[in-house]
Amino acid sequence: MKLLVLAALLSVSAAAHIITPRALWQFRDMIKCAIPGSRPYSEYNNYGCFCGLGGSGTPVDELDRCCEIHDACYTQAKHLESCKSVIDNPYTNSYSFSCSGTNIICSSKNKECEEFICNCDRAAAICFSKAPYNENNKNINKKERC
């Protein structure tokens, strides 16, 4: 019985790991649409107090504030009934969007959770495109500055 439960947990975990990179790639692609030539993972991960995994404290600048707002948007999404399952949640759910120039369009065919997450990512990508990037806020000491 214990082996059956363990197998079920591992299969759910494996499914989440398969889906997660796709969801992250979509956000990355959205940022690349809004900011052509950008390198989202290397530029925005571990930037300020909120960009990257987790986040707390006070944003260090406008760009970091974009990440704080994005985190809050995902928190709101988790309260939607349609975003509460293992697969349909902000961190693993994929959605449909298109890019025309630097214009990001979330598909009208997205379901409720997908639409909400797509719009969270869209708003963040647009916010990133308008915020100045300060190299001094990359890989900061979060204990001291956040």
Curated annotation (Swiss-Prot):
Q: Which Pfam families match?
A: Phospholip_A2_1
Q: Does the keyword Secreted apply?
A: yes
Question: Which compartments is it annotated to reside in?
Answer: Secreted
Residues of the propeptide region, as annotated, are: 16-22
Q: Which cofactor does it need?
A: Ca(2+)
Name the source's superkingdom.
Answer: Eukaryota
A GO MF annotation of the entry reads: bile acid binding
Question: What does the note accompanying the cofactor annotation read?
Answer: Binds 1 Ca(2+) ion per subunit.
Instruction: Give the GO cellular component terms, alphabetically.
Output: cell surface; extracellular space
Q: Show the catalytic activity.
A: a 1,2-diacyl-sn-glycero-3-phosphocholine + H2O = a 1-acyl-sn-glycero-3-phosphocholine + a fatty acid + H(+); 1,2-ditetradecanoyl-sn-glycero-3-phosphocholine + H2O = 1-tetradecanoyl-sn-glycero-3-phosphocholine + tetradecanoate + H(+); 1,2-dihexadecanoyl-sn-glycero-3-phosphocholine + H2O = 1-hexadecanoyl-sn-glycero-3-phosphocholine + hexadecanoate + H(+); 1-hexadecanoyl-2-(9Z-octadecenoyl)-sn-glycero-3-phosphocholine + H2O = 1-hexadecanoyl-sn-glycero-3-phosphocholine + (9Z)-octadecenoate + H(+)
Q: How is it modified after translation?
A: Activated by trypsin cleavage in the duodenum. Can also be activated by thrombin or autocatalytically.
Cystine crosslinks: C33-C99, C49-C146, C51-C67, C66-C127, C73-C120, C83-C113, C106-C118
Signal peptide boundaries: 1-15
Give the quaternary structure: Monomer or homodimer.
Q: What family name appears in the similarity comment?
A: Belongs to the phospholipase A2 family.
Q: What does this protein do?
A: Secretory calcium-dependent phospholipase A2 that primarily targets dietary phospholipids in the intestinal tract. Hydrolyzes the ester bond of the fatty acyl group attached at sn-2 position of phospholipids (phospholipase A2 activity) with preference for phosphatidylethanolamines and phosphatidylglycerols over phosphatidylcholines. May play a role in the biosynthesis of N-acyl ethanolamines that regulate energy metabolism and inflammation in the intestinal tract.
This one is known as Phospholipase A2
Q: Which organism is it from?
A: Cavia porcellus
Give the gene that encodes this protein: PLA2G1B
